[in-house]
Amino acid sequence: MKKLLKSVLVFAALSSASSLQALPVGNPAEPSLMIDGILWEGFGGDPCDPCTTWCDAISMRVGYYGDFVFDRVLKTDVNKEFQMGAAPTTSDVAGLQNDPTINVARPNPAYGKHMQDAEMFTNAAYMALNIWDRFDVFCTLGATTGYLKGNSASFNLVGLFGTKTQSSSFNTAKLIPNTALNEAVVELYINTTFAWSVGARAALWECGCATLGASFQYAQSKPKVEELNVLCNASEFTINKPKGYVGAEFPLNITAGTEAATGTKDASIDYHEWQASLALSYRLNMFTPYIGVKWSRVSFDADTIRIAQPKLAEAILDVTTLNRTTAGKGSVVSAGTDNELADTMQIVSLQLNKMKSRKSCGIAVGTTIVDADKYAVTVEARLIDERAAHVNAQFRF
């Protein structure tokens, strides 16, 4: 049985090194691996001994914490319906018969959409308070950055197409988008910002060199969006440090997207994650491989902020944006007549929808290398609900 356990854990640890694919699980034996300190010798007394003091029971460890999520499995968390203008119909030929001014409930294209890519990279200081070489209470303080990519449907990219309203009266018409632009890509680059986490880990059961342990962790950060890219044929644009409207319904203010826009706020994402895990390790001299399972929940909430495409406040050369013509047929309508704007996308906007975990369960495999019972380096890989790698280097005082 011992040989089988050794083989499984060693194989898992070696596999993690060749398939590095949030919050780490960590070695369940970590509270008891470093039993000596660089300044003070460790104490292996009995906690039931009346002569033992808390000074004998407590120790500190510090080190580096690096966590690198290459792909978090996320999906949107939105309602099934979305409020916007009525969709064009087959009776709208040269242009819309009636321009949309009233919101109607339409199927939400963002509902249940999966994100194509979600990355997050964290570098932090690690501090742990150890009790009786069995329990750890720890925290991390550092910085995180990230990247999100998804189909434009996940972000409710919409615009107005086919309007018959003339440009001279467009600003006062209070029109709303009627077309969902679902065949495009949206990218979000997240700036580097402060991040923290807290947790606890316990070695619950030991038998020889095997240790069964459990941990619980919580992490939080609130980064801002550094750059927003919309890769869409009908309306392509990039915004550095985007701003938008929180809780705003259509129609947006006609100044939205211009330098004169007011009432906007920076686009930021409130990140929360908590995780519970159970893991088994087996010590082989200076190596301690382990394998664990985890259950976690993560959310990215941007308050459903609505961001408008950048545009000019006043038309230059009869245009306020560089959106291309869409229909590609017929003659160009002269300025000052109906349908002069019908063939280009107008008042384009998107919103940053709330996202959450698409899968809650995952596995982790890793190994810890201990030197002189004072220093340790842990390498870990996580799979299923995310593809991630973790590195932790620490020493005991």
Swiss-Prot record:
Signal peptide (UniProt feature, chain positions): 1-22
Q: Which gene encodes it?
A: ompA
What's the source species for this entry? Chlamydia trachomatis
Keyword field contains Glycosyltransferase = no
Physiological role: In elementary bodies (EBs, the infectious stage, which is able to survive outside the host cell) provides the structural integrity of the outer envelope through disulfide cross-links with the small cysteine-rich protein and the large cysteine-rich periplasmic protein. It has been described in publications as the Sarkosyl-insoluble COMC (Chlamydia outer membrane complex), and serves as the functional equivalent of peptidoglycan.
Q: What's the chief localization of this chain?
A: membrane
Asked if the Swiss-Prot or TrEMBL record annotates the protein with the keyword Disulfide bond, the reply is: yes
Localization terms from the record: Cell outer membrane
Q: Which Pfam families did the record assign?
A: Chlam_OMP (PF01308)
The alphabetized UniProt keywords are: Cell outer membrane, Cell shape, Disulfide bond, Ion transport, Membrane, Porin, Signal, Transmembrane, Transmembrane beta strand, Transport
Mind telling me which InterPro entries this protein's record contains?
Major_OMP_Chlamydia (IPR000604)
Q: Give the record's GO CC terms.
A: cell outer membrane; pore complex
| Membrane topology per record | Multi-pass membrane protein
The coiled-coil segments of this chain are none
Give the protein's recorded name. Answer: Major outer membrane porin, serovar C
Q: Give the record's family classification.
A: Belongs to the chlamydial porin (CP) (TC 1.B.2) family.
Top-rank taxon? Bacteria
- Which example biological process does GO assign this protein? monoatomic ion transport
The subunit field of the Swiss-Prot or TrEMBL record says: Part of a disulfide cross-linked outer membrane complex (COMC) composed of the major outer membrane porin (MOMP), the small cysteine-rich protein (OmcA) and the large cysteine-rich periplasmic protein (OmcB).
**A GO molecular-function annotation:** porin activity
